[in-house]
């Protein structure tokens, strides 16, 4: 089967493959974050005007010629590695490519996005322009879901091998077409070798997130199809390795896990579920995921702990002004407060506005104006 994912300026309610073939102009590379994926045995007749196979192969040739000096048996010397502490405990290894390699990986990423029309399944939300955590959670809130299954994949980036990426790309247009061309096959495979470290995708590389979203298209498609066909008003999202499936009615989550495992097995996926992070609950409990809670009323909220922390920050900021109403906070601290307020307003606009209004009245001040003044310094 071949998977074709197209970005659209608009998505007709009943978009069919026949409509795509007859009206190829609806395939657009404009400013949009919605996509539609089709799974077909044959894609005869599908020839987007923006795609030119010879042009793409030549671009890969030029890329490989200019980066030949970085093709090494031991890629580790082109990376600096360090570890950061995870909130859940333990450490996450970060492999940061050197400037030349990072520049090369960004160039290859641009080739994939510009020439290959590389896209993501519409249920993916991480590392995608115009998509974010808030939109990911909003999809479930807008669905008025009551029951939620949360899980994630273990060692997601590190387990994705070079061989697995090639295998999955052979199912995805237009990579399948390039791989079917002898010259294109050699050039694409050579270029992709610059993206791997110690047998997996390094966290810290600018191209790793895009590659994971790309190769997950067949899996995302199958999971979403299963969820939508088998549960009443259900919703599926994936944020990197974090999975959420929700519905207005309860469901047998073990059956869902079992079916998804079958999908992963059929695709030869080298990763699987993290049982310790698999939870099934309704929204009467602490329904937190990705730092955002969906409460019993179906509304998104930052939760009382973060509200308490915000109030502490606001109080500290107000008290930091001297007699001349000048803020003595460091610039970076003011920027942090401004960013926190902006982010929280995306999640819970009215609730955050109420907190700020409360403190403005309580301390006879204008917090937003004070922040703007502090940032001018």
Regions found by a protein language model. Give the residues of each.
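Short beta-strand
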Residues: 234-238
